[in-house]
Amino acid sequence: LTGNLYHPGIRDLYGLQCWIATLIILGGIGFPILFNYGKLVNHKVRNLFYRLTGSSKRMPSHVRIVNTTTRIVITATLLLLVGGTLLFWLSENNNCLRGLPLRGKLAVSFFSAVTPRTAGFNTVDLTSLLPSTWFLTLLLMWIGASPLSTGGGIKTTTITIALKNIINTLRGKEKIEIFKRQLPSENVRRAHAIILLSILWIGTATCLVAFWVPEGSVTQILFEVTSAISTVGLSLDFTSQLNTAGKIIISLTMFVGRVGLITLLSGLIPRQSSQSYTYA
């Protein structure tokens, strides 16, 4: 459709937007999470059947099915959905949401909080958004979806672990605990490495595109690069202005975002065998 989901024929179909948003959320949660909850529902149904039939059999409880990763993903997803919806509504209430009915404002705000994290659809004119909303959309694109899902970004688990580590550092705590479970130090190092590499790549790609395509504003270029590395597809009407060099940089950024910087660099840089050191 011309204009994406902002097409005049469908942009007021709020029910359709909610259905699409639901599918986006399910795709962005990750297949292991969906499998875990499917398994949980299956076990609860079977336990109910066993109780009704008087059988002594019992399936494992949710404690062993819904693990720490699942809880992190669900909690982070809910916070991003609720927070993103409220912030979009507050930011655009007197701008692009003006004149819409209450259900329309809620549907558009909810959809606009969902789609930047993985899908790339839009039901509003992105170029008419306020700078605060651009920054919100950029942040949601950068965070992205969850591990082993259809979305990109640095992932919800990465940002959660990094934020928890910052909080613990400020409190003077050495161990990282989430939901009463201690996280391995390797996970913490990996989370910070992913964030740092992502910021470095976005900054470098933004500078290169700005050099080769000087007619673009910094906001447009940064938005385009972040959308590319998170494999989202949103743009502030800047993609058509890219020349050959700009297209190559954006294409390479999309490839890196899809494969993952850690994965890509791990394949290019040989692993060093562990060595033991003795300190005097």
PLM region spans:
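Membrane-proximal intracellular helices of multi-pass ion channels
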Residues: L1-A280
